[in-house]
Amino acid sequence: MVKHHDVIGRYVTIEVDDCEYKVFYLQNGKGTPLICQHTAGCHNHQWRDLLEDEEIIKNYNVIAYDLPRHGKSDPPLNKEWWKEEYKLTAEHYCNFIVKLCQALDLDNPIFMGSSFGGNVALQLALRHPNKFKAVIPVEAADYAPGFYLDWWRHPHANAAQVCASGTWDLMAPQSPDKDRWLTWHYYTQGSEAFKGDLYFYSVDHDLRNELKNIDGHKCPVVMLTGTYDYLTPPEATENTARQIKGGVYIEMTDIGHFPMSENHEVFRVYLMEALKIIKERTNK
């Protein structure tokens, strides 16, 4: 059987904080830009099913990129990056996303990210509310300490196996085996970046005293978290949303920490609800 797909992949070179990045992204659909960030230590194939969801791509231009050092996006081309430890900061992370959106000429995009991508969605709503139509933080919270650990890159551990194995019990047991194993497989490939990603996730990201400064009326914030996620439990997300002016929280049953990758058919139901809320709030 031969089947050609409509999803296209391209590269764009951008400069962010004096770093030159050649960034890979996948794109499909027409309409409102919906730009998607993968989880820590992973890449854009987590969004594989969203990119081919016929109902979504009729109305949304879905773009899923690889963060530098992940997937097909290399570390900075103009730096001796191997001579220093990778530690992703909130400022650089946000600057990268804004520059990428500008380079792709995205007009008032919706940003959606999961886990450490969900946390940066909150950062964007705080720092750049006028640059986004809305944000959808998935599996996110104001603070997530305790995961910046040395053994993610310890010489006595097989980092690829350790990082991948950590995903297994974060997924709902009833999610399809094929998708659970693909989620595991993706995580065998990104162990070198995983610890540096978690510097942002557990150290530099702390919005406990800043949530009051996020205006969900100016930039709608619709937060989604799965019931099987113990890394960012539903109550942590709900507590975060409650402190944001106009913040919305939706609990996703029967799904875990990697919803778009472990079970798109369940995830899409809640995503459609989130997109409906955003449309109602931004089309007034």
Each model region followed by its residue ranges:
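Flexible "cap/lid" loop of the alpha/beta hydrolase fold
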Residues: 119-163
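Conserved HGGG/HGGXW glycine-rich cap/lid loop of the alpha/beta-hydrolase fold
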Residues: 21-79
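Conserved alpha/beta-hydrolase catalytic His-Asp/Glu region
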Residues: 146-147, 151-152, 159-216
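Active-site loop/oxyanion-hole signature of alpha/beta-hydrolase fold enzymes
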Residues: 18, 64-112, 269
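Catalytic active-site module of serine/aspartate enzymes centered on a nucleophile-bearing elbow/loop
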Residues: 247-284
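Alpha/beta-hydrolase fold catalytic core
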Residues: 1-35, 57-60, 106-107, 272-284
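Short beta-strand/loop motif that positions the catalytic acidic residue
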Residues: 217, 223-225
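Acidic catalytic loop of the alpha/beta-hydrolase fold
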Residues: 227-232
